[in-house]
Amino acid sequence: MARLCAFLMTLLVMSYWSTCSLGCDLPQTHNLRNKRALTLLAQMRRLSPLSCLKDRKNFRFPQEKVDAQQIKKAQVIPVLSELTQQILTLFTSKDSSAAWNTTLLDSFCNDLHQQLNDLQGCLMQQVGVQEPPLTQEDSLLAVRKYFHRITVYLREKKHSPCAWEVVRAEVWRTLSSSAKLLARLSEKE
């Protein structure tokens, strides 16, 4: 009986905490890692973007699905987690390692991995709190399709240096937009 009461009390406290917090507080280092990842990505540039103009492509970043002004606060963590996971997957592929300075690539991927750990910790706290809204599922699917287009592009271009430069610049813009999503977390509703 005592165990049942303790269990019910724990559930009550957890549901109260999660309804009040809409997720969790990311460590202060999360923002710093995001800024550092942007800096590292800029330093990874090997070619002038001007030399790769013929390779440019519009990957159709799903801005309307991940817009910091329109997205609900409860959706920010899952969307950021998906963005970070997709970027990490892209840059840890065997084809990626040949394109970049290994030291910069390792630092970049380590920062992304730490960010992903922070975000997944928050996601674990959200499990069972609420059903994901359909708009969140739409956002996650849009992010996956966006990165699928990038992967297909790299394959079509045979992972050429210019293709990777185009993708690096695109991912830099994507990470910049994730900084706006991070700012959304600290806003009052």
Swiss-Prot record:
Q: Which PANTHER family match?
A: INTERFERON ALPHA-5, TYPE I INTERFERON
SUPFAM superfamilies, A to Z: 4-helical cytokines
Keywords assigned by UniProt?
Answer: Antiviral defense, Cytokine, Disulfide bond, Glycoprotein, Secreted, Signal
Q: Mind telling me which Pfam families this protein's record contains?
A: Interferon (PF00143)
Q: What start and end residues bound the annotated signal peptide? A: 1-23
Gene, per the UniProt record: Ifna12
- SMART domains from the UniProt entry: IFabd
Q: Which GO terms describe its cellular component?
A: extracellular space
State the family named in the UniProt similarity comment for this chain. Answer: Belongs to the alpha/beta interferon family.
What's the name of the protein?
Interferon alpha-12
User: Which taxonomic lineage does the organism of this UniProt entry have?
Assistant: Eukaryota, Metazoa, Chordata, Craniata, Vertebrata
Provide one Gene Ontology biological process annotation.
Answer: defense response to virus
